């Protein structure tokens, strides 16, 4: 029904709005090894792994049935992180991708594991490397460290690396 469709869309909007009210974030950064990515390649790879453009000019990844926001992606620029401009994306060079998980999160383990997996798949596809939010190469040890921080996160807590 029309009402069901509206409520479904509103649920997605509410989930995305969680980004604006998040207390903390865990981020993974993916940088190509040699040179900036073309905007066209960036768009293709994000879409290939199920990310959709949406609120705050980010790409968002949802759970399997599309009802729960798992994580989002911004582009990395010379001045930091920024949203994507779809009008100019095909011609913009992209220096890197910032994957981020808003905390607290109702399905944090699945969200973190999906973000970790997709960031590594994309890094492999663009001949890049995954780094943590402190720009340390994302080793298996760091992966476990950040995964436990995400899972153990409690409202009001600071994320300390």
Please annotate each region the language model reported:
Residues 1-17, 21:
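Extended, low-complexity intrinsically disordered regions enriched in serine/proline/glycine/threonine
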Residues 44-52, 78, 117-128:
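Short, intrinsically disordered, mixed-charge
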Residues 19-61:
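Extracytoplasmic beta-rich ectodomain segments of secreted or membrane-anchored proteins
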Residues 14, 20-22, 26, 44, ...:
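Core, soluble structural subunits of large cytosolic macromolecular machines
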Residues 52-84:
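Ser/Thr-rich, low-complexity intrinsically disordered terminal regions
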Residues 98-161:
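Well-ordered alpha/beta subsegment
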Residues 22, 65, 91-94:
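Short flexible coil/turn linkers enriched for glycine and charged/polar residues
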